[in-house]
Amino acid sequence: VIMINYLMGFLSNFFNPAVSFVAITDHKSVINKLSRIYRFAKIINSSVDKYSYIGINTWVVDTHIGAFCSIASEVYIGLATHTIDNLSTSPIFTERKNATGHSWVECDHAINRLQTEIGNDVWIGFRAMICGGVTIGNGAIIAAGAVVTKDVPPYAIVGGVPARIIRFRYSQDIICLLYTSPSPRDGATS
């Protein structure tokens, strides 16, 4: 079944000039034709809006990516979690098909897959990691190597492990103005 999903994703994006021939997408992912997905990127159960690009060998899982986003190479977005309220965190106890190749259950137990949201005009640096369920606000910048475990406000610049706010790109007055003015993201023209 997994192979069929990837094959369907490959075929659905075969004629999409936005997706590299050697990128991997599944049939649930929606890639805007005005975006770019570079080689060896893996896009699973996600959407990528117009004028955004995803760098080489980047993984995107269970994520919506807004317009005008710049995502560097080797970034991981929507990192999976393990159950932590069971006796063990091993997927042997929750999934029939898992990374170990072994299972002690006859049916899969529900695992809460968290949707990750990346706003518009977000820049994510090389080898950053974004945990599942995080929301990154419009205009935010994620520094290279950062590990984002919590929501990031609009126009914040974050970095570190775990990521923390370094500063904001603009004053709060300008950020408010940006939210009340029409922008190219909304289809406005000058």
PLM region spans:
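Flexible, glycine/small-residue-enriched loop-and-beta-strand segment within the central core
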Residues: 15-21, 27, 36-134
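Basic (Lys/Arg-enriched) interaction patch that binds polyanionic ligands
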Residues: 133-135, 139-151
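Short hydrophobic helices that act as membrane-entry/anchoring signals
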Residues: 2-5, 9-13
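Solvent-exposed, charged amphipathic helical/linker segments at domain boundaries
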Residues: 166-176
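Conserved catalytic segment of ABC-fold P-loop ATPases
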Residues: 153-155
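Conserved small/polar residues in nucleotide/adenosyl-binding loops
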Residues: 179-188
